[in-house]
Curated annotation (Swiss-Prot):
The keyword Transcription regulation does not apply. This is Phosphoenolpyruvate-protein phosphotransferase. InterPro entries: PEP-util_enz_mobile_dom, PEP-utilizing_PTS_enzyme, PEP_util_AS, PEP_util_C, PEP_util_CS, Phosphohistidine_dom_sf, PTS_EI, PTS_EI-like. The active site is at H191 (tele-phosphohistidine intermediate), C504 (proton donor).
Length: 572
């Protein structure tokens, strides 16, 4: 008899295969065992650290190839944990001073760190706790000589079943054999869920009981469209889901026909669909999905996973590669956005109570021009290889933009004097992420060439709600009328001055938001490359005039719920 288990749909698609239970290894040890050879035990711990670094570096490099640099960046964070003296030194001291065995010392110290970080009302610190837990498990396995599960060794068609998949588990999945996965815990924003979408593997998380309900070798259906897992389906259910899977793949194939199509509404209004990228390694997906440009090139990934700043020459080569590959299509490059949830070990940034509102992005770059100027020089030199736009992140005041522009113009003059060719067709813009910037959009619009609305931060700053906090996640409301009014204000201010506005947050690729944004007059929608074809099909079926009427009604609503109901009634 079949069994239906409900979970959270994390990644689209339908998978049908036998269950492969990811069994947790036995990492038990005698916590009270004391050692006499202290130096030998410290050496055992140090060797486990080095072995973990080797493994994680391989996993990180594989993840960059399969998933792109932005998804691989989590392993840069894991490698930083293994180099953190504030974590490593107390473990070594515990072995030396208390004769603790390496496994016990590691577990005691990392548990303390995890407890402290998890209690903080700061999402970056909570994510760091998860990193420490994952890394600690890997180091412990080397101390004990126990192998961790290795999904990369799977060589038959399976659906993986487990309590949870760590980022390193997910990064090692082979798409040829792993048809999908289902876990007890997790949510749509967990690392494994995000990676499953990049791999385009159907996934269900948060089932609570899948490891109790499924046995090794059971037939499993994962319906990533509805959040259903079926264990040991009946013959009729198998036939029905095989048909559903075929229809899903047929739809994906149909979408591919739109790869080279225009994005134009039924009443003839054009929109631009661009892609977000982290490094040149992301370019194949951009081209395969028919992006009309790059609306966000996150340059911070060039700075991560290394122990020193990238040189001007290294940056120049990366920017040049992207501009040449896009063959004259617009490439919007965001200057370094470090701080907040992104750290660089070699910068020694100060610890802050609230790093998201602190020393980050343009604030850091203006203060540390030895970082900022080489990046601007590299961008200016690369500008002759394509259509380059530059935007500054986290701009709060017009003076910040003016100062950043002045530095850029100064470096442009320096480069010309050095004999370099520089394009005279570079547009300069800003990210609109701060409510104050949106409120003064009319002032900024007189001086910038374009706006790019970063909705991820704009929403949480406007509603004072951390989008990663479960307790206040109900307040993270993309369709709240206050957000729509700010977006409208920014777009109208830019159009009044003959400028354009794009959007590069998650909202830009959201099927509920797209009709509203189209109606508000958004010029460019920048999203993950895998969302582009669906968005193109959606926009090509909408009327701009009708969506304008919809948007005008939406900004007059009182609640997000009213807006969603309005959209659902308009767009059926």
């Amino acid at each position: 008899m079949s069994k239906l288990i409900k979970g959270i749909a994390a990644s689209d698609g339908v998978a049908i295969a036998k269950a492969y239970l990811l069994v947790e290894p036995d990492l038990t040890f005698d916590k009270n065992e004391k050692v006499t050879d202290v130096e030998g035990e410290v050496a055992k711990f140090n060797n486990a650290i080095e072995a973990s670094k080797v493994e994680l570096t391989k996993i990180r490099n594989n993840a960059e190839v399969q998933l792109g640099a932005d998804k691989a960046a989590i392993f840069d964070a894991h490698l930083l944990v293994l180099d953190d003296p504030e974590l490593i030194q107390p473990i070594q001291d515990k072995i030396k001073n208390e004769n603790a065995n390496a496994a016990s010392a590691l577990t005691d110290v990392t548990t303390q760190f995890v407890t402290i970080f998890e209690s903080m009302d700061n999402e970056y610190m909570k994510e760091r706790a998860a990193d420490i837990r994952d890394v600690s498990k890997r180091v412990l396995s080397h101390i004990l000589g126990v192998e961790l599960p290795n999904p990369s060794m799977i060589d038959e068609s399976v659906v993986i079943v487990g309590n949870d998949l760590t980022p390193s588990d997910t990064a090692q999945l082979n798409k040829e054999f792993v048809q999908g996965f289902a876990t007890n815990i997790g949510g749509r924003t967990s690392h494994s869920a995000i990676m499953s979408r990049s791999l385009e593997i159907p996934a269900i998380v948060g089932t609570k009981s899948i490891t109790q309900e499924a046995k090794q070798g059971d037939m499993i259906i994962v319906d990533g469209l509805n959040g259903d897992v079926i264990v040991n389906p009946t013959e009729d259910e198998l036939i029905a889901y095989q048909d559903k899977r075929e229809r899903y793949f047929a739809d994906k194939k149909e979408l591919q026909k739109l790869r080279d199509a225009d994005t134009v509404t039924v009443d003839g209004v054009h929109a631009e669909l661009a892609a977000n990228i982290g490094t040149p390694n992301d370019l194949p997906g951009v081209i395969e999905n028919g992006a009309q440009g790059i609306g966000l090139y996150r340059t911070e990934f060039l700075y991560m996973g290394r122990d020193q700043m990238p040189t001007e020459e290294e940056q120049f080569e990366a920017y040049k590669e992207v501009l040449e590959a896009m063959d004259g299509k617009r490439v919007v490059v965001r200057t370094l956005d470090i701080g907040g949830d992104k750290e660089l070990s070699y910068l020694n940034l100060p610890e802050e109570m609230n790093p998201f509102l602190g020393y980050r992005a343009i604030r850091l770059c203006l203060a540390q021009q030895d970082i900022f100027r080489p990046q601007l020089r590299a961008l200016l030199r690369a500008s002759v290889y394509g259509k380059l736009n530059i935007m500054f992140p986290m701009v709060a005041t017009i003076n910040e933009f003016r100062e950043a522009k002045a530095i850029l113009l100064e470096e442009k003059e320096n480069l010309k004097n050095e004999g370099h060719d520089i394009s005279d067709d570079i547009e300069l813009g800003i990210m609109v992420e701060i409510p104050a910037t949106a409120a003064l959009a009319d002032v900024f619009a007189k001086e910038v060439d374009f706006f790019s609305i970063g909705t991820n931060d704009l929403i949480q700053y406007t509603l004072a709600a951390d989008r990663m906090s479960e307790r206040v996640s109900y307040l993270y409301q993309p369709y709240n009328p206050s957000i729509l009014r700010l977006v409208k204000q920014v777009i109208e201010a830019s159009h009044k001055e003959g400028k354009w506005t794009g959007m590069c947050g998650e909202m830009a690729g959201d099927e509920t938001a797209i009709p509203l944004l189209l109606g508000l007059g958004l010029d460019e929608f920048s999203m993950s490359a895998t969302s582009i074809l669906k968005a193109r099909r959606q926009i090509n079926g909408l009327s701009k005039n009708e969506m304008t009427e919809l948007a005008n009604r939406a900004v007059d609503c009182a609640t997000q719920e009213e807006v969603i109901e309005l959209v659902n009634n308009y767009v059926k």
